[in-house]
Amino acid sequence: MFQSILFLAFYGRPVFGSAAARDYACVNTAESRDCWKDGFNIETDYYGKEEAPEGKLVEYELTLSQQIISPDGYEMLGMVVNGQYPGPTIEADWGDTLRITVKNNFTENYNGTAVHWHGIRQKETNWLDGVPGVTQCPITPGDSQVYEFRVTQYGTSWYHSHYSLQYSNGAYGPIVIHGPSSANWDVDLGPWLLSDWYHDDAFALDHVGITTNRAAIPKSSLINGKGYYECDPTNDAKCTGTRDYYEVVLKQGTKYKFGIINTSTILTYTFWIDGHNFTIIAIDFVPIEPLTVDTLNVGIGQRYEIIIETNPDFDDDSSFWMHAQYCFINQTDIVDDKVGIVRYESAGSSDPPYINKSDYHLNFGCADPKPESLVPILKQQVGAQANPLAAEDYFRVGLGNFTWPDATNSTGSVFLWFLQKLPLYVNWSEPSVKKLTIDETADFPPNSRPIELDYETGQWVYFVIESDWDPAGAVDQYGQEIRVEPSVHPFHLHGHDFLILAQGLGKFTSDIQPNLDNPPRRDTVDVEPLGYVWIAFQIDNPGAWLFHCHIAFHSSDGIAIQFLEQPSKLKPIMEEAGVLGDFADRCNKWDDWYQAVNIPHNATQADSGV
């Protein structure tokens, strides 16, 4: 469990983090969490490349492999990091440099791999974003790759494999970058990874899904790799009988901070703790004005830093359930909503009393907190739109029958999702960064879904994502009418935070007015079932950046595009960094491996690749 960490730091009120404005006068304590050190604080403009404190080098080694695990008391062959699920916490301070060596030990299933550092902008280090087929070729089994980058943001996040569905089998862990907070707290409880869990291999489940158009239903929900699945060990050898809810013990009169991360495969969760309110102080990597709520939706990939204060009205032997239910109305009992226990320090070990869910929780829906309630501390104004945005440019989510373009994939016609016309399909051996820097070609196949953003640094681009639109006349690859299915879609952008100009239910129409004055800013947003989101971000980070639904099955089945941002600027950046040689070597090694091992063993790419 994390303990409170006190940093000797100084405080100023800089204008865009200007060193001249810093007075170095404040210390980071339980009474001044908005301070950090060396004049850096909650108001520092962390989007400037140099706007982070001087830091140290922090090194980690992560080995990805397979082993039998039973986080909810039922055994399955999972994917682990350093022999554990979830993987170990990557922990650093704002301004540190992380050097992480990732080793691929998937020697039995012939899987490549790559690790994505979710929410880390990778400013001018696009090739370290960890997306096979987009920013790199996969790491071959038995090989390793070093990811080294400076962390200029702070808060709570996670790392995960971005190779097909590996993270759904367990290949992920938390990231904590310590920095200032927008409200005071006493003790840091660390990251809480909230996840749905299956008892079958995610790759196999997805194959069933795309051939039958039936989504796989999770078996249980977990916090930090702990959960409770009801089974009988006398009748099922895989039922180990060792299962536990995640528990925390709190002390009266104390403010606790924790970061909640939805690391699920399919479920957006509605989260609450019986008898308690909590205060949101950050969304993704963005500190906000404190917002007190009693219930919170957490989409896949979203993070919230939260403060919970123990209730003086409760006895010190009280205990309470933590709840996480599927957000979709009328399907809230898809898994048991009890996911953990909060105990006050003198409470025993018995289960808390169960409080029946009210209509408030049953009908809470899948919406993010109201946009007007999420006010970033560091203010940003949205500039004028540089890109064309007619209705035909909207990113519309649909479902249809398609065939994967890879000749080695023999699945034939399958049910695939798409974002604007075609499902994404990347070539692991020919990632976009390779095309832009080594091959220097604009030959991007249609299914690689490239959208070029060749604008000047500082300009703004706007995009609309719709899940409620009229598909009349739109047909799939086999001439069947496209379907619009009511599903929540948590969309994640790599390489940027975006600003949310508007968000809601129903169709997006031209009379909707954008909020351009310091709107909510984050990297993952929920598009409600049959809803829309209007976003904008600033051109300032050359590279190939994935934008995708973070329901793992949806991303695997095609809901993604990639932005090619200032493509001509990427090669000079990589040449200056001296990384093109290693990049090419990794692709050559992967291509040789894939041709010599994967294809003969029928272990070929069977989905979008991401």
From Swiss-Prot:
Coiled coil: none annotated. Keywords: Copper, Glycoprotein, Metal-binding, Oxidoreductase, Repeat, Signal. GO terms for molecular function: copper ion binding; oxidoreductase activity. Residues 1-20 form the signal peptide. Disruption phenotype: Abolishes the production of pestheic acid and RES-1214-1, but accumulates isosulochrin and chloroisosulochrin. Induction: The cluster is expressed in rice fermentation medium. Expression is correlated with the production of pestheic acid. Three regulators are located in the cluster (ptaR1, ptaR2 and ptaR3), suggesting that the production of pestheic acid is controlled by a complex regulatory mechanism. Glycans are attached at residues 105, 111, 262, 277, 330, 356, 401, 409, 427, 602. InterPro entries: Cu-oxidase-like_N (IPR011707), Cu-oxidase_2nd (IPR001117), Cu-oxidase_C (IPR011706), Cu-oxidase_fam (IPR045087), Cupredoxin (IPR008972). It comes from the Eukaryota. Belongs to the multicopper oxidase family. This is Oxidoreductase ptaE. It comes from Pestalotiopsis fici (strain W106-1 / CGMCC3.15140). The gene is ptaE.
